[in-house]
């Protein structure tokens, strides 16, 4: 493959093509351009002050009560997912 001719050795119509800038490597092109400044982030608006945590506490209390009720009934599985021994005995006796 022939090497590119330098603009000094250009003759005739080839000289017009070589008047353009030679392509450079990508890293050289990117480093030549100044980095545009990043716009500063706008401060987020804070909502009106309410009693802190009232909504969270209500939800947490409701969930705790549901878990306690389910535990009282004896239908909820234990923490590790195993069934209780009483449930196993009752299912085997019915068969």
Swiss-Prot record:
Protein name: High mobility group nucleosome-binding domain-containing protein 3
Domain of life: Eukaryota
Assembly notes: Interacts with the ligand binding domain of the thyroid receptor (TR) (in vitro). Requires the presence of thyroid hormone for its interaction. Interacts with transcriptional regulator SEHBP. Interacts with nucleosomes.
Molecular function via GO: chromatin binding; nucleosomal DNA binding
InterPro entries: HMGN_fam
Location within or outside the cell: Nucleus
Keyword flag Phosphoprotein: yes
Keyword annotations: Chromatin regulator, DNA-binding, Nucleus, Phosphoprotein
Similarity annotation: Belongs to the HMGN family.
Protein function: Binds to nucleosomes, regulating chromatin structure and consequently, chromatin-dependent processes such as transcription, DNA replication and DNA repair. Affects both insulin and glucagon levels and modulates the expression of pancreatic genes involved in insulin secretion. Regulates the expression of the glucose transporter SLC2A2 by binding specifically to its promoter region and recruiting PDX1 and additional transcription factors.
């Amino acid at each position: 493959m022939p090497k590119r001719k330098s603009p000094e050795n250009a003759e005739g119509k080839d000289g017009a093509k070589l008047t353009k800038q030679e392509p450079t490597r990508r890293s050289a092109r990117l480093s030549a351009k100044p980095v545009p400044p990043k716009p500063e982030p706008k401060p987020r608006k804070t909502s009106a002050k309410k009693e802190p945590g009232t909504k969270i506490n209500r939800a947490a209390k409701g969930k705790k009560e549901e878990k306690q009720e389910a535990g009282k009934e004896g239908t909820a599985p234990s923490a590790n997912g195993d069934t209780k021994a009483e449930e196993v005995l009752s299912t085997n006796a019915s068969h």
